[in-house]
Amino acid sequence: MVEHFQKRGIPIHGLGMQMHIGVSADNAGIAGGMRQLAATGLPVHISELDILVSDWKKDVDLVYSDELQQKQSDKYQFIAQVYKQSVPPHQRYGITVWGVSDAVTWINPNFGLRDWPLPFDKNYHKKKAYDGFLEGLRR
């Protein structure tokens, strides 16, 4: 699509990835998508990042277990790490997390889910997801 628009003289100044994903989202697909965007030479922005432990499934009994917390942390780390590995520094526009705290997530009220998709809990305390994200940025 980018090439098609550019050939028609339509200016494109950058590309964004909305990433409202679950903990089971395919890592190979995510990495491949980032490489494809980077191959355009345009700035790449992860414009909306939140990672659902429910994987978009309605489960009123879902518990934010240690296992789910770790999976979420691992996915946040992977996203930050693959962004840095796949997108050259001059093309990195940034990563925007779509909210700060689980207290204000748009996911639960809009989709009727029980989830904890953000790096801070409802009391604005850091979660494992925060640590994973930070570790991914450091690598």
Task: Describe the predicted segments one by one.
Residues 19-20:
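His-enriched metal-coordination microenvironments in redox/metal-binding proteins
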Residues 23:
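Acidic, metal-coordinating catalytic cores used for nucleic-acid/nucleotide bond scission
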Residues 15:
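Active-site-adjacent helix-turn-beta-strand microarchitecture at beta-sheet edges
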Residues 1-8, 26-34:
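Distinct, well-ordered alpha-helical segments
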Residues 29-45, 49-139:
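Aromatic-rich peripheral "rim/lid" segments of glycoside hydrolase catalytic domains that contact
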Residues 7-11, 87-90:
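Short helix-capping segments at alpha-helix termini
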